[in-house]
Regions:
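Long amphipathic alpha-helical segments
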Residues: 21-60
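Amphipathic interaction/junction segments at domain boundaries or subunit interfaces
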Residues: 48-142
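Glycine-centered helix-coil hinge/cap
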Residues: 17-18, 71
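A general alpha-helix detector
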Residues: 4-12, 50-54
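Short terminal or interdomain "cap/linker" segment that borders an active site or interface and mediates
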Residues: 4-5, 115-133, 138, 142, ...
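Secondary-structure capping and boundary motifs in well-ordered enzyme cores
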Residues: 1, 43-44, 141
Length: 197
């Protein structure tokens, strides 16, 4: 994965848990000699996996919890790292944004030529819910997609509920997410997001 991803993990950890925690995560991840990640350098996926594994031990969270938190953080992080215009041009509403995720990755590939992006297909239903199909060469990143969806909900001020209804990790052909926009009767958390169902 590109250094941009690993830098985002680093910033998420240092922002929420401090620099000392980041240094403690680097040691079991065998990255003590690495001072920084270069945004446009492609790193082996194993580097990211080691960071997540070390973070689970240090923070006492599951890998899925960390990846979901990271997915939500990623939306804000990329907006502040110079990609706000790319995000803005992808869609003015959450449904429109989800329809154009593959276009976003195609444009991002101009700056990241070794990018191996996932593919998304969004299906809209009459009740305003959506099914988002996620396909990737990489495994284990579906929890990040859940976080991304919640991050996008916050970006568009659109409270939502997300349920993963099919999982490659459990033998399904694809990862599939049910996205339901909030109605006035749904329980809403203080930060504006909905409770997980």
């Amino acid at each position: 994965m590109y250094g941009l991803v690993n830098r985002a993990i680093q910033q998420m950890v240092t922002t929420h848990h401090g620099e000392d925690t980041w240094q403690r995560i680097k040691e079991p991840a065998d990255l003590l000699d690495l001072d920084f990640f270069s945004t446009y350098q492609a790193y082996p996926d194993d580097v990211t996996h080691r960071l997540v594994a070390a973070a689970t031990e240090e923070l006492g969270l599951s890998g899925d919890q960390i990846m979901q938190a990271f997915g939500e953080y990623w939306i804000t992080y990329t907006a502040t790292e110079g990609y706000e215009q790319l995000l803005e041009s992808t869609g003015e509403t959450l449904p429109e944004f989800l329809d154009h995720l593959d276009n976003l990755h195609a444009r991002a590939a101009l700056a990241f030529p070794e990018l191996q992006p996932p593919s998304f297909r969004c299906e809209h239903h009459a009740d305003a819910s959506m099914q988002l199909e996620y396909r990737s060469k990489r495994r284990g990143l579906a929890p990040m997609v859940t976080g991304l969806l919640h991050g996008l909900g916050k970006r568009f001020r659109t409270p939502l509920a997300v349920d993963q209804i099919a999982s490659r990790d459990q033998g399904d052909a694809t990862d599939l997410f049910q996205v339901r926009l909030a109605s006035p009767t749904d329980p809403v958390l203080p930060e504006g997001g909905m409770r997980h169902e």
